Amino acid sequence: MASLYDMMLRHSLYLEGAKKGTADEFSSSVVSDLDAVVKRAFQNINVDNFGEFTKADFNRFVADIRLRTNDVHNKNTKELMNDTKKLSRVETTLFQGMFREDTGDRLATPSNVWGSVKNSNIPATGQTFQKSANTFRNSSVGNIERLLRNGYADKLDTTDVFKSIRGVKSLGYKDGVFGKISGWGRTLASTLMSHTSSSVKDKIAPSYYDEYQWVSVLDDVTTEICWERDGEIYKMGEGPQPPAHYNCRSMTVPISPSREDIEEPDTLAEWLDGQPSEVLKDIFGDVDPSLDNVKVISLDGLRDKLDIILI
């Protein structure tokens, strides 16, 4: 049987794969829906230059786009919330399985895990799920509206305003505000999933363990707060929880009897060197094992990983 430390690190890599898949799907859906809304709105105006708008017509144009882009965000946020709710159920199953395997105890699952998770403040934002999603929505809609108002104030050509929002094909549409929104969307989804996983663990682990250790991925992009917390041991229910910031990759590992006299590796690379080949192949496929190379998996795929996590 794997040590709890090995189980938790394997799980964290599978979780990264699930986060990648969900975050990419969410951001792609948001941008695709926004693109359709903005494109349709621009096709319905009869001006070649924003200076040709009357003030009343321009305000109606902006109000229509604001309404429709808000609808896009509300629809996609609802789908993301459904994904995080599903993740909470998956993580409840996985953590119960790991903790029961490690301790031999079969304790009851805490009630209302999802309700506790969704209403808690995310350490990275200081806000609940819904408020964090609202911040993303307001930034997205506000940036689109800002470009529209700049176009009107500066009497810009309609095509130039459209390109400033959508970007240009030769640059992969990454130069427009949609490129920024895509990145913000991935960050939001990834952070909400990290918080979901961490909160589920924090809800279940105190029934089995008294303390936990903070474990950070240490590399050239590790933040100061995660460097400082790496290796620190806290009492259950009293210490900090990831995500400490947006895109946080840190995790916590309960202090378990199975970790006695185990010398833990200093780096992820050293730990990977000691893992069974079948585990590495399942996590990374045929590429070199590293955090950037974890395979994308679905939430259903994550749910099915308990057996290999326990090897």
Model-derived features: positions:
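Acidic, glycine-rich two-metal-ion catalytic cores of nucleic acid-processing enzymes
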Residues: 162-267
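N-terminal leader/targeting and assembly helices and adjacent pre-domain segments
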Residues: 1-171, 258-311
